[in-house]
Amino acid sequence: MPSKKVAKEPKSVSDGARVLEQLKAENIRWVELFYTDVFGGYNQVDVPLASLDEESFVSGVPKLDGSSVRGFREIFESDMLLVPDIRTLATIPWNPGAGGTVRFICDVRIGGTKAPYDHDPRWVARRTEQVLADAGFDHSYWGPEIEFWVFDSVQLVPSFQGVHDAWAGAGYQINHSEAPWQVGASQPPIRFKEGYHRTAPTDSLVGLRAEMCNILADQFHVVMDAHHHEVATASQSEINVRYDELVPMGDHIQDVRYVIKNVAHQHGKVGCLMPKPVYGDNAIGMHTNQSLWTKDKNAFYDANDKYAEVSQTCRYYVGGLMKHSRALCAITNPTTNSYRRLVPGYEAPVFIAWSRANRSASIRIPAYHRGRPTVKRVEYRTPDSAANIYLTEAALALAGLDGIKKKIEPPAPVNENIYKLSPERRRELEIRELPGSLGEALDCLDSDHAFLRPAFAPSLIETYIELKREEQLELNLRPHPYEFYRYLDV
C-alpha cells in the first residue's frame, strides 16, 4: 500500500490563494461548506466564492451557530468556525441554477480561540490517527462496505404528522418495483432473500448505482471498487470504495451517503440508510474492514500463522474488539431500528466471536487469498449504515489498540455456524451476545468507555449517551400500530 503521512491540520495561506485562483478561473460562484454533526448528519452552509479569502482556509469562516446543532454547544458559547479542508474540494453536479458550485468538508473550530472542537467527529477521527501513530502505527487502512436502499417512494399513513399525535399513530408504506408486494410491476419481483448479485432487468438499479459511482469518482474523487444488488428485495444495494486512511475514508463514506440520497432524489426516488425498513428480509449493514501498518508493513499479517495468516498483534486487536463489542454497539449501531437487524436468521451478527471466512461471526478474517500481506485485514461485521463513520472508525481503532496495549488474547476462533449452536455450546466457546436494544447498548457504553478516552472527550460521550437515551425514550413512549393488532382484544 502507498505510504502516506498521518493527516494533520491542513493548509497555509498560499494553498488557499492557489485554490481561490483556480475556482475563480473556473467561474465558480458558490461554495458549500460541509461539516458532520455528532450523529453523522452532513450539514452545509453556502457562501459566495467572493466572500472567501486566503485566510478563510486557515482561520475559518464564521458561519456556524453551535447551539443550533444537536450535540454541539450551548447558546451562551455558540460562535463557531468552519475551516475548509482544501483536499476535499469537489464539484456539485445538481445545482445548475446556482452557477458553478463546489464543496469543501470543514473542520469545526471554537470561536475566539480557533481551537479544534472536541465534539467534531472529524477531529475525533484525526485525533485517533495521532493516537495510532504514537503507538507505532503510521497508517491505518479502512474499507467500509456501505449498503443502502433506493425506494420508489415511502409514505407514512395518514401523514408524517401522525407520529406525533396523541390519539392516532402512523403506519408506513414502501413502494418499489422489485418488491413482491408491489401491485402492477412490469417485471417479476425479487423474492425475499433472493436479490444477491441479480442482473438487469431484475436488478432495476444497475444504471442508477453506476451513475452514483461515476459522480463519486468524477466529481468527488472517490476511487470505486464495485457496486451490486444485495440479498434483500426492494432495491437493497451495496457500494464498495477503495480502501483509504481513517479520516479520508470518513470523508468518502459521508460523500457516498450524500450522493446516494441526491442521485435518488434526482430520479424521484428515496435514498435510504435506515437499517431495517423491510420486515421479513435482510437489513443493511456496513461491514468495516481495517488494518494497521508500521511503515510499509501490515502489522496484521504473519505468513507463519497456519490458521488465517494473522499476527499476534492482529489477535490482540481482535481481542480488544471482542472485549468492547457490546459498548461499541452504541456507536456502530446507533438507532433503535439498528437492533431489528441484529437478530438471528438474516445474515447479521448476533454473537461476539471471530473466525476465518465465517459470516456468522461478528469478526471475520477474509480468506480469499493466501500469501498476500497487503490484503490481510479484520472485517468487523456489526456496524450499519446509520452509524457516524468518523466515530465508528475511531471507536473500532481505539478498542483494537486497547487490546494490543493490554495483550488481550481472544477466545479460540469459531469454525461453526454460530446461529445453529446450542446455548450450552456457545457458553463452552465463550460466545457472548450483542445488545438487544439501543438502551442496552447505551448501558454498555456508559459502563465501558475508558478505552475511548485517548480521542473522545468525556463531554462527547456524556452528550452522546444522553441524547441517544432520549431517542430510545421517544420510541418507548409511543403505542405501535402492531400493538393494536396484537393487543386490542385482550
Which role does the model predict for each range below?
Residues 2-490:
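Glycine-rich, acidic/polar active-site loops that bind/position phosphate-bearing ligands
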